């Protein structure tokens, strides 16, 4: 289940996600 702020690193790994605390790729990998 992907949360509302779920953003794959393929789109923009530099985009700070409020849910991941600004670390998108770190949580997915």
Curated annotation (Swiss-Prot):
The gene is psaD. It is found in: Plastid, Chloroplast thylakoid membrane. Keywords: Chloroplast, Membrane, Photosynthesis, Photosystem I, Plastid, Thylakoid. It is a peripheral membrane protein. PsaD can form complexes with ferredoxin and ferredoxin-oxidoreductase in photosystem I (PS I) reaction center. PSAD may encode the ferredoxin-docking protein. Belongs to the PsaD family. GO terms for cellular component: chloroplast thylakoid membrane; photosystem I reaction center. InterPro entries: PsaD (IPR003685). Residues 1-29 are annotated as: Disordered. It comes from Populus euphratica. This is Photosystem I reaction center subunit II. It comes from the Eukaryota. GO terms for biological process: photosynthesis.
